[in-house]
Amino acid sequence: MSNNKKLTSLFGAPVSDRENSMTAGPRGPLLMQDWYFLEQMAHFDREVIPERRMHAKGSGAFGTFTVTNDITQYTSASIFSEVGKQTEMFARFSTVAGERGAADAERDIRGFALKFYTDEGNWDLVGNNTPVFFFRDPKLFASLNHAIKRDPRTNMRSAQNNWDFWTSLPEALHQVTILMTDRGIPKGFRNMHGFGSHTYSMYNDKGERVWVKFHHRTQQGIENLQPDEAARTIAEDRESSQRDLFEAIENKDYPKWKTYIQVMTEEQARNHKDNPFDLTKVWYKGDYPLIEVGEWELNRNPDNYFQDVEQAAFAPTNIVPGIDFSPDRMLQGRLFSYGDAQRYRLGVNHWQIPVNQPKGVGIENICPFSRDGQMRILDNNQGGSTHYYPNSEGAFEDQPEFKKPGLKVEGEAYEYDFREDDDNYFEQPGRLFRLQSKEQQERIFENTANEMQGTTLEVQHRHIRHCYKADSEYGKGVAKALGIDINDVDLEVKD
């Protein structure tokens, strides 16, 4: 007698034959009453959910975050309340531009999203493996997506579209420079740093606020691929980073990262030379040193990729008391776009999917005002309890003890041009370039020339001009690699 599980329909009815359809005679047409065939095909036709518009190709794992340093002077967040405290977490790493089937070893930014299941609710910290971004206003989000993805006519990735967009934004040079360095192709997800990128805020139990940036430093060491190595890797294994992460965890070689913050007081922010909320710039560590916070380890692979990785939903609106937002325009834009994208992709009740549930609080303790919606399957839809406020039963009482400290804002509502406030586009990419060794600088030139193949002379001149303004040797090196005489480039044009 077989101990194998017996095949049933989705609703539990036994299936008598899984291979042969019901027909009118041995060679006749199929019958519509073959309900199992209909059920199978109808489900198959709907298996694929919308992929993420960005960060479509990803890998993830569960782990544990441990506090290693007391930062309660900055934040009242329970997750950081005492040294040694541990919190369950989930991490998802990804490429950005490629679709769900893209190769892992492409030159691209890597997504770096963390979900902490704290005892005050889920905290999502979304970021990348770079500390900056291409621009600083979210109105350009959709255009970036269009420029780096497939051309509407050819349906092919277009270097011209990509570089035309990047070079039309002088503030993009910092991110582009990072992307053209050796770190543009990490060997794997385990061998790269991560950044919250945005400026966030923290406040303590006295209501005192500071601005912070998050850093996650790999304990496996930084390792990258050169273009020829990446090409071989892609030819041999398109899932190289995913395989490396999965197999390391399966073999109990658990990857670890240390988390740090940079802290800027409100007074320092008011006197900062640049806009401290500008996502195209970093805070220099010499001025704002790294402060250790904790360490996290990924130690459990998902049992099912679709359930835990594909359906993982991150949104920077998922914060906890003691952590808050900032005037960073890009962060403000993401506060809407991330949650909205997840509601489109997974439905309004995606918070009930296991990987997204507030495990640290317990689903039974969730008391949301929201009801109904597709796939409301847990919490009995709050049963027959009161579903409005105010009410006479005291349901949905506020928790005023968790009010945030006030944030002073001023000014007229207007579409302010960032460039009129700050046109210091080139200082930081120039400084980054000079931090590279001569060999690393040469690779930046070579990588740039390779990536710019297929672009117009106008776009190439524009990029050379930006590089030259960051550092003359940077501009000369890129020009030489592209086979362009630097004297033929108008270096004084203001883009």
UniProtKB/Swiss-Prot annotation:
Active site per database record: H55, N128
EC number(s) stated in the UniProt entry for this protein: 1.11.1.6
GO cellular component entries: cytoplasm
Superkingdom in the source lineage: Bacteria
Binding positions for heme per the UniProt entry: Y338
TM helices/strands, residue ranges: none
GO biological process: hydrogen peroxide catabolic process; response to hydrogen peroxide
Catalysed reactions, semicolon-separated: 2 H2O2 = O2 + 2 H2O
Ranges for region Disordered: 1-25
Keywords: Heme, Hydrogen peroxide, Iron, Metal-binding, Oxidoreductase, Peroxidase
UniProt key word Iron: yes
Molecular function GO labels: catalase activity; heme binding; metal ion binding
Pfam families recorded: Catalase, Catalase-rel
Cofactor(s) this protein requires: heme
Biological function: Decomposes hydrogen peroxide into water and oxygen; serves to protect cells from the toxic effects of hydrogen peroxide.
Subunit relationships: Homodimer.
Stated family: Belongs to the catalase family.
Protein name as it appears in the record: Catalase
Species name: Staphylococcus saprophyticus subsp. saprophyticus (strain ATCC 15305 / DSM 20229 / NCIMB 8711 / NCTC 7292 / S-41)
